[in-house]
Amino acid sequence: AALHRAGYANRAESVAPGDGLRLDDAYITAVVRCAPPANKPKVEERDNCLPYLLRELELLERCRTIVALGSFGWDGALRAARALGAEVPRPKPRFGHLAEADLGRWRLLGCFHPSQQNTFTGKLTVPMIDAAFDRARALTNSVSE
């Protein structure tokens, strides 16, 4: 629903493949491709999956904003950007909700991961998710103007 509210999706929910959901100016991917034990990905799994993320970013020529869900996604995006030649600031930008990092070609935006733990405890709320995708839209619009 958050992608729909921010104008990235043509409908608020999808219940089955082929049900008509369409993303506009958005692409969803993952730093880790497998379902890790206890839903806790390991650094080795992230590193093994890095080539897939690199290839996706290479193919997404129009991509200007990356929303990283969680610190694991943030670190994976920084690694991918560095591997593709981006000048990642030193010290490494710290993850936080609505944290931003300028990676040259991309603007990286942090958002707490929408896990059950984060949403049930209130660490991540609907207004916070909306703020992240609204900010992503603003960042994307500012670089494409």
Language-model features: locations:
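A polyanion-binding, active-site-adjacent surface
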Residues: 1-93, 97-142
